[in-house]
Design a protein with these regions (language model features):
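A short beta-strand-loop-beta hairpin characteristic of the jelly-roll/cupin
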Residues: 295-317, 358
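Short, Lys/Arg- and Gly-enriched loop/turn segments at beta-strand edges
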Residues: 330-336
Length: 427
């Protein structure tokens, strides 16, 4: 087995984020079992090597039967997604069939509305045209034109030059009119990527839950669990310190939010997806990223996993596994050939630590759904999602917990709701 101790880190990550990587971004291509360590400062006389680990790569660690089961079980989890942000790569003006708001248009609108705080020129709109005239890149917000609302004869360039000399109030009025023709939703390039396992709360979906794929394909997902547990066992074998930290955190969760007996709550499944340069987010920082690849057996080329700041790349083939620091900038080289490459990324979602019991999280789900469907609710309105500010410290939620036998959780919010013990739980 090979061990590489890197001497330098090239600070180019921020410049590369969101761009595609290629063969020019690495000098070392790893195609054999290998451990790679980041530069270790000379001042660290007794380093804990796990603190400096960039990656551990092992080839051929899965049987062909296990790979085939994982492929058949997980490939459908990688549906078309627009939620991968910069990892989906750069957007051009007419890419993916969308009429993107270009970077030039975005900057001109910001300038005309007065939100471009760095403008110092007497002719800022003209300056934007000089700076971004030849850019075909979509704007950083990922917005698209609502072509059904935008007048067919609207020409952005003519409009921009016609309003630039209006008074500030008149310009703002014009800009607001144009903003009405632009989507409020941000989009990324569509890619084949999805999640399986379990997911934490966030504002619009305020309950921990089983992902859609694992709910709707429970048998298939269950068939993939031995493959995922095998990755976890390799994690334990190769990086025991990081595994122990992550496994301890996962063990604190309700078993219903753990994938088998693994150190993971969640997996991301990508299908023939060339990721642009990015850093992973949302995983347990003290843990480590674990990735494996399976395929349909048809050859493909490329898809090297590149760490541009370390000038290193790894050729992860079906049946291999890599443990990697996903918080370092990384991405893939182009993928060629007819083969279907399925990458499986296993991790613990950091905010899963906030999840309580399955019964409690299910109660949160049912509470939200009951509100959403109850058109007699005082807050109800068309397209309401059942969520409102402060809802988890209301008498409505407190009584719902009591009625559903979740007295322990009701007691935890009793004082916040009533200002004192209500006496309800004493009855």
């Amino acid at each position: 087995m090979k061990t590489i101790y890197l001497k330098n880190k090239v600070d180019v990550g921020e410049k590369l984020l969101g761009t595609f990587l290629d063969d020019s971004h690495y000098d070392i291509l790893i195609q054999e079992d290998c451990d790679v360590y980041k530069p270790i400062p000379a001042t660290d006389k007794n380093p804990n090597l796990e603190d400096y680990l960039l990656l551990k790569f092992r080839k051929g660690v899965f049987s062909s039967e296990m790979q085939e089961t994982a492929y058949q079980s997980l490939r459908e989890a990688a549906g078309e997604s627009q939620n991968r942000g910069i990892a989906a790569g750069p957007r051009t003006e007419k890419s993916t069939g969308r009429d993107w708001v270009t970077l030039l248009q975005e900057k001109v609108l910001e300038t005309l509305s007065g939100t471009m705080t760095t403008v110092t020129s007497d002719n800022p709109v003209d300056d934007m045209y000089v700076k971004y005239k030849y850019s075909t890149e979509a704007g950083s917000r990922g917005s698209v034109w609502l072509t059904q609302k935008r007048p067919k004869d609207f020409d952005f360039d003519i409009w921009a030059h016609s309003v630039k000399n209006l008074s500030p109030n008149e310009r703002l009025e014009e800009v607001e009119k144009v903003y009405d023709w632009i989507s409020d939703t941000s989009y990324a390039n569509p890619v084949n990527s999805g999640i399986a396992g379990y997911f934490d709360r966030y504002p619009r979906i305020p309950y921990c839950r089983t992902t859609s794929y694992s709910t709707n394909h429970n048998d298939k997902f269950g068939a993939a669990v031995p493959f995922i547990e095998r990755i976890s066992n390799l994690f334990k074998e190769l990086i025991p310190g990081r595994w122990k930290v992550q496994n301890t955190e996962v063990s604190k969760l309700d078993p219903s939010f753990r994938i088998g007996n693994s150190a993971y709550t969640t997996i991301t499944v990508n299908k023939t997806y060339r990721t642009a340069a990015h850093r992973d987010a949302g995983d347990l920082k003290e843990g480590f990223g674990n990735l494996s690849v399976v395929s349909n057996g048809v050859p493909y080329t490329g898809a090297y996993l590149v760490f541009p700041e370390f000038r290193a790349a790894v050729d992860v083939q079906p049946g291999d596994v890599i443990m990697m620091d996903v918080h370092e900038v990384h991405g893939n080289t182009p993928i060629g050939g007819e083969g279907e490459r399925i990458s499986v990324v296993c991790y613990m979602r950091e905010k899963m630590a906030d999840c309580k019991t399955k019964a409690y999280e299910d109660a949160r789900y049912n509470f939200v759904e009951n509100r959403r469907l109850n058109n007699k609710h005082p807050l109800w309105h068309e397209r309401w999602n059942g969520v409102s500010k402060g809802m988890w410290e209301t008498q409505e939620w407190y009584k719902y917990l009591v009625c559903n036998g979740l007295h322990e959780y009701a007691a935890q919010i009793e004082t916040a709701v009533y200002g004192a013990k209500s006496g309800v739980l004493d009855i």
